[in-house]
Amino acid sequence: MITGEPVMVMHGGPGAGSHSSATRFFDLQRYRVILFDQRGCGKSSPSASEDDATAALTDNTTRHLIDDVSALRHELNIDGKMHVFGGSWGSTLALAYAIAHPATVQTLILRGVFLCRRADVDYFFQGNAAEFAPDPLAMPVPGTYLDFPTAWRHFVDAIPPKDRGDIVKGLAKIFAVPPRTEAERARLVKAASACVAWEGSASRLNHDENSHGQPNGKYALTVARIMVYYMINGGFLDAKSEASRDNNYILDNVARLSGCACWATDIIPIEPHDCSPV
């Protein structure tokens, strides 16, 4: 029988899949670290990397993922409270799970907290895309692009100019149609790779702006499709109402977490991570 304090790891993306590197944050002699691939990605099937991703995106919402975590608890005989760990989208899912099932959460350990509000998504994806200027500093619109201008140009160049008024909607339009020819598939992979490369660039403090290596096509399709599908639906955070990009679900329900200890990790120059209670 496997013992140790259970830690449920929520991976990012959404769509990035789990990775064993997440275990390095824990003493495996003390903690039982649980990794799982969310619907449509990693080792889960069907995969969003297929030409037609309809099956992978059907019954794939935050509510379904929360139910999957509950099913895992049952399957792994976790009867008491557990630690819940996640970064970026993983922090979103961790918070949504804790709001739904606060009695099962001992601690929340979060990094790169993402609340999945329209303002958060627009800050990351939109920037000056509507009136794309080669010199991002010529545009006063705030956004992540100001910190990564070269990577931003590579990203926006993959989006048709007519669809840059709403980048997320434009990407959703591209990913909605299964490719019928190799040329169409190449365009699809190009857009997906640009999307994932941008996300990777803007998620790292030490990213080399002059490096524009593209992620694996299958991986890029998986992450980009699932990520855009969730972002355009506000992360499917409120199961009681229609999916919407205009919500503040987590902060509106944060009082439900009053019984959970919550730690947020801050990236600082000297050390990789520093934990402080919030």
Language-model segments: which ranges?
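Conserved HGGG/HGGXW glycine-rich cap/lid loop of the alpha/beta-hydrolase fold
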Residues: M1-E50
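Conserved acidic catalytic loop of the alpha/beta-hydrolase fold
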Residues: R63-M82
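Conserved alpha/beta-hydrolase fold motif
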Residues: V84-F85, A264
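Conserved alpha/beta-hydrolase "acid-adjacent" motif
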Residues: D238, D266-S276
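Short beta-strand/loop motif that positions the catalytic acidic residue
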Residues: L257-G259, A264-D266
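Alpha/beta-hydrolase fold active-site neighborhood
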Residues: D163-E242
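A catalytic-pocket lid/entrance helix-loop region that shapes and gates access to the active site
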Residues: A103-K173
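Short glycine-enriched nucleophile-adjacent loop
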Residues: S91-P102, L108
